[in-house]
UniProtKB/Swiss-Prot annotation:
Gene Ontology cellular component terms for the protein in this record: cytosol
Membership in a protein family: Belongs to the UPF0434 family.
Domain of life: Bacteria
Pfam families referenced in this protein's UniProt entry, alphabetically: Trm112p
Gene3D superfamilies in alphabetical order: 2.20.25.10
Taxonomic placement: Bacteria, Pseudomonadati, Pseudomonadota, Alphaproteobacteria, Hyphomicrobiales
Name of the molecule in the record: UPF0434 protein RHE_CH03977
Provenance organism: Rhizobium etli (strain ATCC 51251 / DSM 11541 / JCM 21823 / NBRC 15573 / CFN 42)
Signal peptide, first to last residue: none
Annotated InterPro entries: Trm112-like
Amino acid sequence: MDEKLSRVDPKLLELLVCPLSKGRLSYDREHNELVSEKAQLAYPIRDGIPIMLVSEARRLDE
C-alpha cells in the first residue's frame, strides 16, 4: 500500500463524524478505513479520500 495513502491526517479525524450516528471515527490502518464503533460501520478510504456514504460502508460484524 502506498505510504501516502496509508495515513489519515489527525485534524481530519477531528472534523469527520459518522453520517449515520454522528459519532467519532477512528482510523483502522490495517484495512485503510474510518471506523464508527457506535454505528458498527467501517468507511473505506479510496485514493486517499474517505468515502462517507452509509451505502459504501462495511458492517463490522462481517
